């Protein structure tokens, strides 16, 4: 019976090989190294996809630090890559910062409708934040990237992001159902102010267009062929607890997840005596790794090392990203470090 439950390959190669994936979310508790992992995954995907976009939805915007390059809310090419792009969005931006192009039109009716639109939308809980995401999704879909990687904010924000299609669909659905009741009143208001073009269709046209996009995204998020979520954690109680909560919430939302990255692990090297602190930490991590193996036997569990230097800059991210595909070997890493030092010494 034991042979029937062989552990799955400890790498993210399954994601690279699944060409149908459009949306990949990377998330977990704060401070576990989500950004390094999401940037590394994006780098590996860029080797195998026509075009890849990584989006940071974390207000801290750490992807600029990871690649050592400033990114904005417009997709920019990552230095050293031809097909990898990055952008940073603020999940707290509301409708006041939606572009004016969203409310196109030269007449005063459209200018008034922007204010009315914001007032109505603002009255629906959660819609304001969700609509800013909706506008981003509209932009991303129009650019037609092969794969989009989301470097998400800590767990709570992430779950809100993933539920936004439902929130928007529910809220906009209510508005559109009210359209017939409000239509005569809106037309009267338009006539009163001498704006014959201001009617219910003006107000709801954009909503209907947005709702179509939202429904498509909602459908795609719940399709395991197109969307998956990679959970990142460290081998500690609180992180493992948060990961289990996240996995349960994702399952409840109908979002696929079958990969877990355990980051910042200590690895023992043959012939090297660890210090007392390292031995103690190694023992604690071993206990939680056993629990992870029991809880997630049907997941790909990737183990990443705790490094003595930061992973910063495109070249270092490229190098670290290999660990997502090939299981980390401390002996191999030590040999590579020695070779690098010798090369640096020669170049000097």
UniProtKB/Swiss-Prot annotation:
Alphabetized GO MF terms: ATP binding; ATP hydrolysis activity; metal ion binding
Give a Gene Ontology cellular component term annotated to this protein: GET complex
Name the enzyme group at the top EC level.
hydrolase
Coarsely, its chief localization is: cytoplasm
Localisation per UniProt entry: Cytoplasm; Endoplasmic reticulum
- State how it assembles: Homodimer.
Purpose of the protein: ATPase required for the post-translational delivery of tail-anchored (TA) proteins to the endoplasmic reticulum. Recognizes and selectively binds the transmembrane domain of TA proteins in the cytosol. This complex then targets to the endoplasmic reticulum by membrane-bound receptors, where the tail-anchored protein is released for insertion. This process is regulated by ATP binding and hydrolysis. ATP binding drives the homodimer towards the closed dimer state, facilitating recognition of newly synthesized TA membrane proteins. ATP hydrolysis is required for insertion.
Q: What is this protein called?
A: ATPase ASNA1 homolog
Q: Which organism is it from?
A: Culex quinquefasciatus (Southern house mosquito)
């Amino acid at each position: 019976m034991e042979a029937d439950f062989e552990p799955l390959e400890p790498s993210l190669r399954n994601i690279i090989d699944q060409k149908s994936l459009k949306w990949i979310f990377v998330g977990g508790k704060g401070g576990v190294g989500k950004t390094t992992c999401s940037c590394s995954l994006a780098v590996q995907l860029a080797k195998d996809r026509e075009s890849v976009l990584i989006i940071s939805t974390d207000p801290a915007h750490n992807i600029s630090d990871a690649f050592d390059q400033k990114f904005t809310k417009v997709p920019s090419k990552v230095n050293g890559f031809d097909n990898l792009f990055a952008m940073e969005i603020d999940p707290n931006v509301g409708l006041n910062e939606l572009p004016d192009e969203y409310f196109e039109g030269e007449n005063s009716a459209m200018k008034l409708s922007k204010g009315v639109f914001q007032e109505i939308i603002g009255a629906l809980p959660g819609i304001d934040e969700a609509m800013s995401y909706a506008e981003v999704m509209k932009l991303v879909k129009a650019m037609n990237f092969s794969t989009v990687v989301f470097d998400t904010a800590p767990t709570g924000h992430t779950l809100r992001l993933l539920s936004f299609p439902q929130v928007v669909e529910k809220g906009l659905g209510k508005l559109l159902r009210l359209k017939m009741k409000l239509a005569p009143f809106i037309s009267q208001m338009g006539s009163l102010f001498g704006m014959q073009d201001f009617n219910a269709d003006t107000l709801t046209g954009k909503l209907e267009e947005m709702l179509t996009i939202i429904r498509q995204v909602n459908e795609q998020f719940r399709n395991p062929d197109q969307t998956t979520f990679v959970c990142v954690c460290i081998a500690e109680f609180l992180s493992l607890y948060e990961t289990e909560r996240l996995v349960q919430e994702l399952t409840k939302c109908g979002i696929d997840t079958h990969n877990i990255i355990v980051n910042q692990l200590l690895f023992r090297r043959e012939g090297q005596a660890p210090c007392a602190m390292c031995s103690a930490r190694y023992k604690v991590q071993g206990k939680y790794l056993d629990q992870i193996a029991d809880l997630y036997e049907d997941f790909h569990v990737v183990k990443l090392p705790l490094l003595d230097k930061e992973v910063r800059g495109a070249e270092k991210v490229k190098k670290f990203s290999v660990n997502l595909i090939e299981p980390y070997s401390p002996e191999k890493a030590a040999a590579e470090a020695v070779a690098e030092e010798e090369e640096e010494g020669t170049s000097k």
